[in-house]
């Protein structure tokens, strides 16, 4: 479906070709980080882009975003091989803390491990004796499954150093992940299994989604999806799920394929700052018959989101200002400009068919233009350049 979405979004076909063409090999290493403030060792398995497959191979040239991934209750990190095999070749570094694997995990300690690894990886980037020297970008995501998804909310709470939060069948934690949502404002993507009986969406992810104060949040429910199928086979997880739903009507590889169809463009947008991927992501939401979804971005529920020819922006790229042209029947809506991480930086009601928008005080870079009227919104993008 991802390829289909790329073809449907014909304006972005060249982007999709590049994205799908990346093909790094998977290197891996093990690092024990030491948090001196907590007197705590944090054993971490790390998978990264390399020109060669294997342990401790050199990292490929580039600056790669970091993803911290939290495991589920009693689920070994190795059960998430499907994630590193899908994402490392696309140019991401995945870090799996192997802490809190016992029968009585401390969820707050686990969340604090996420935060420490995220900051430590940035230090590794500056350490000329590290395998990761000069290979890490400043952009970081928190991801997790089940208990690890819940811990991700705890780690993201009031955390200005994380670019996006993503979780899969997230479960409530102690302290409460649900309570933490009200202090989370970063763009967030929640995956749920429609037939998950271990952490049913109605008792877990639905409440988390509703509580978020994110600038942009999306919840995707995979029709017939289960709890354990986000990961590879794990005996304890499968046993627990079989006790309440022994006959899922979806295959594991199908659920993982659906997940990747949405996860990859979201990461490309939120961590690699490819703004066209946000359009691909939303095209896929609307085109897919295998999911249901809720989305709320910038304070407005998105009922319909598309690029349309009748709304024109010129010139683009922009030096100091652009003209916004709109048909008469679309007047009296609001134009909103967001930066690349989804923060609103401009808002204006449009009352004329041709309006000049001044960007002279904007930094150079990419921006999203939303035009919203009633229950519809249109999206486009601009590039701001320095004035000669």
PLM-predicted stretches and their roles:
Residues 224-226, 233-303:
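Alpha/beta-hydrolase-fold serine-hydrolase catalytic core, especially in secreted/extracellular enzymes
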Residues 183-257:
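Active-site-adjacent alpha-helix of alpha/beta-hydrolase-fold enzymes
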Residues 78-97:
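Short amphipathic alpha-helix adjacent to the substrate-entry channel of hydrolases
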Residues 149-159:
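Short glycine-enriched nucleophile-adjacent loop
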Residues 56-63, 108-147:
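Gly/Ser-rich "nucleophile elbow"/oxyanion-hole loop immediately N-terminal to the catalytic nucleophile
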Residues 305-388:
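C-terminal outer-membrane/trafficking sorting elements
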Residues 22-62:
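N-terminal cap/lid segment of alpha/beta-hydrolase-fold proteins
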Residues 64, 71-75:
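Active-site glycine-rich loops that stabilize anionic/oxyanionic intermediates
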């Amino acid at each position: 479906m991802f390829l289909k979405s790329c073809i449907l979004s014909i304006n972005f076909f060249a982007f999709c070709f590049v994205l799908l063409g990346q093909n790094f090999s998977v290197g891996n290493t093990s690092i024990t980080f030491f948090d001196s403030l907590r007197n705590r060792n944090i054993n971490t398995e790390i998978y990264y882009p390399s020109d060669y497959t294997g342990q401790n191979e050199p990292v490929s040239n580039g600056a790669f975003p970091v993803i911290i991934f939290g495991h589920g209750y009693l689920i070994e990190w190795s059960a998430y091989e499907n994630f590193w095999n899908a994402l490392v070749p696309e140019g991401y570094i995945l870090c799996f803390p192997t802490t809190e694997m016992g029968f009585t995990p401390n969820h707050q300690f686990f969340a604090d491990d996420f935060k420490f690894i995220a900051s430590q990886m940035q230090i590794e980037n500056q350490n000329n004796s590290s395998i990761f020297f000069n290979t890490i970008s400043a952009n970081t995501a928190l991801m997790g499954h089940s208990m690890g998804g819940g811990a991700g909310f705890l780690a993201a709470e009031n955390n200005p150093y994380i670019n996006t939060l993503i979780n899969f069948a997230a479960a409530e934690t102690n302290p409460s992940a649900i309570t933490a949502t009200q202090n989370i404002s970063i763009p967030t993507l929640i995956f749920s299994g429609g037939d998950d009986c271990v952490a049913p969406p109605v008792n877990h992810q639905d409440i988390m989604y509703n509580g978020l104060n994110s600038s942009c949040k999306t919840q995707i429910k995979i029709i017939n999806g289960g709890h354990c199928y986000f990961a590879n086979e794990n005996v304890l997880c499968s046993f627990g799920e079989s006790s309440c739903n022994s006959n899922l009507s979806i295959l594991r590889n199908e659920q993982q394929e659906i997940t990747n169809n949405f996860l990859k463009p979201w990461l490309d947008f939120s961590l690699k700052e490819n703004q066209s991927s946000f359009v691909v992501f939303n095209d896929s939401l609307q085109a897919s018959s295998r999911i249901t979804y809720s989305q709320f971005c910038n304070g407005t529920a998105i009922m319909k989101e598309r690029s349309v020819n009748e709304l024109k922006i010129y010139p683009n790229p922009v030096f100091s200002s652009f003209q916004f042209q709109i048909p008469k029947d679309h007047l009296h809506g609001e134009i909103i400009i967001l930066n690349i991480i989804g923060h609103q930086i401009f808002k204006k009601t449009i009352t004329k068919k041709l309006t000049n928008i001044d960007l002279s005080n904007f930094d150079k870079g990419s921006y999203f233009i939303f035009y919203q009227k009633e229950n519809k919104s249109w999206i486009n993008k601009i590039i701001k350049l320095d004035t000669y």
